[in-house]
Amino acid sequence: MSSTALLPPNTDQVLSRRLHGKAAEKKTGLAAIASKDVDEQSRKLQEYFEFWDRNHENESEEDRARRIDGYKSVVNSYYDLATDLYEYGWSQSFHFSRFYKGEAFAQSIARHEHYLAYRMGIKPGSRVLDVGCGVGGPAREITEFTGCNLVGLNNNDYQISRCNNYAVKRNLDKKQVFVKGDFMHMPFEDNTFDYVYAIEATVHAPSLEGVYGEIFRVLKPGGVFGVYEWVMSDDYDSSIPKHREIAYNIEVGDGIPQMVRKCDAVEAIKKVGFNLLEEDDLTDHDNPDLPWYYPLTGDITKCQNIWDVFTVFRTSRLGKLVTRYSVQFLEKIGVAAKGTSKVGDTLAIAQKGLIEGGETHLFTPMFLMIAKKPETDA
């Protein structure tokens, strides 16, 4: 397969090129932020933050409904703004993982991806779909780990450009294709893929039943779907102010229309026709000394090697100040759009919600579900 067979020119792509320029090909992190079109960046900032009020107590049902209806704009604007900071502060794999003593951050991230592929039973040469593939970190790891042929689906042009660039650098461009598309209306024929997976991506859907239904449709009969889902626990109660504050901080900080509970995810996957083979909240097996959220705490004493210090430092109070002042300097000299530092502030809101959600066990980013499409239609 060739990664050059992408999509015809369209408005989103033109705007993406105007905003990001050649950043997708050559730059990462703060250098990528500095290379963006200032006017277009300002427009994206305004577009994203019009969906949110910083105070969850001011949120209305109409606000939530507007985010759900405008999910494509919410998610696209979010990742146009946050992708570079994710790569700078985390990795090319935009997800969490569990940690074992002595295990480096990068090894933990890769093991988490391998574990999903292993539990799904992905075989060499099979056709696999990655739903919401980000910049392709998990896709590259799973392609190399299993020997599969992979299609990555993403609705963000900037991230697709980065996927293609990285695939070429890793000599995977013959094994991977990245396609622009809405996962609520996938641009694939029925019964196309042997396996479909999603890693912390379908949480951005306005309806889990909707996105799971599309996954069911494009899977071949007997095909397997594996997902790490972001969900609130079944103890979550939106009428409790602290519970709602935690969920809202996760939503506003991560571009999520609306968080749901574990039971809602299970109901959705069964309702579209899947046979649910396995469900397991992997945070239940967490190392209490190294919880999944420890890199967000900025506690470098928990780092398992010297290289992890750099990752964890960026989430510390001092690390966030360094990033904020660096971005504010770029704003001051006119290289970055005014308000760009607000993106970092938004990620800090998410950081607070994720840590509190982890500490209270009200939230998990790794609710594993493995499901199978029946061999024949019911």
Curated annotation (Swiss-Prot):
Transmembrane segments: none annotated. Its EC number is 2.1.1.-, 2.1.1.41. PROSITE patterns: SAM_MT_ERG6_SMT. Pathway: Steroid metabolism; ergosterol biosynthesis. GO terms for cellular component: endoplasmic reticulum; nucleus. It is an enzyme of class 2 (transferase). Keywords: Endoplasmic reticulum, Lipid biosynthesis, Lipid metabolism, Methyltransferase, Nucleus, S-adenosyl-L-methionine, Steroid biosynthesis, Steroid metabolism, Sterol biosynthesis, Sterol metabolism, Transferase. Induction: Expression is anaerobically up-regulated via the sterol regulatory element binding protein sre1. GO terms for biological process: ergosterol biosynthetic process; methylation. GO terms for molecular function: sterol 24-C-methyltransferase activity. It catalyses: zymosterol + S-adenosyl-L-methionine = fecosterol + S-adenosyl-L-homocysteine + H(+); lanosterol + S-adenosyl-L-methionine = eburicol + S-adenosyl-L-homocysteine + H(+). The keyword Nucleus applies. Disruption phenotype: Abolishes the production of ergosterol and leads to abnormal cellular morphology. Leads to susceptibility to cycloheximide and to staurosporine, but does not affect tolerance to nystatin and to amphotericin B. It comes from the Eukaryota. InterPro entries: Erg6_SMT_methyltransf, Methyltransf_11, MeTrfase_SMT, SAM-dependent_MTases_sf, Sterol_MeTrfase_C. It is found in: Nucleus; Endoplasmic reticulum. Belongs to the class I-like SAM-binding methyltransferase superfamily. Erg6/SMT family. In Aspergillus, the biosynthesis pathway of the sterol precursors leading to the prevalent sterol ergosterol differs from yeast. The ringsystem of lanosterol in S.cerevisiae is firstly demethylised in three enzymatic steps leading to the intermediate zymosterol and secondly a methyl group is added to zymosterol by the sterol 24-C-methyltransferase to form fecosterol. In Aspergillus, lanosterol is firstly transmethylated by the sterol 24-C-methyltransferase leading to the intermediate eburicol and secondly demethylated in three steps to form fecosterol. Sterol 24-C-methyltransferase; part of the third module of ergosterol biosynthesis pathway that includes by the late steps of the pathway. The third module or late pathway involves the ergosterol synthesis itself through consecutive reactions that mainly occur in the endoplasmic reticulum (ER) membrane. Firstly, the squalene synthase erg9 catalyzes the condensation of 2 farnesyl pyrophosphate moieties to form squalene, which is the precursor of all steroids. This is Sterol 24-C-methyltransferase erg6.
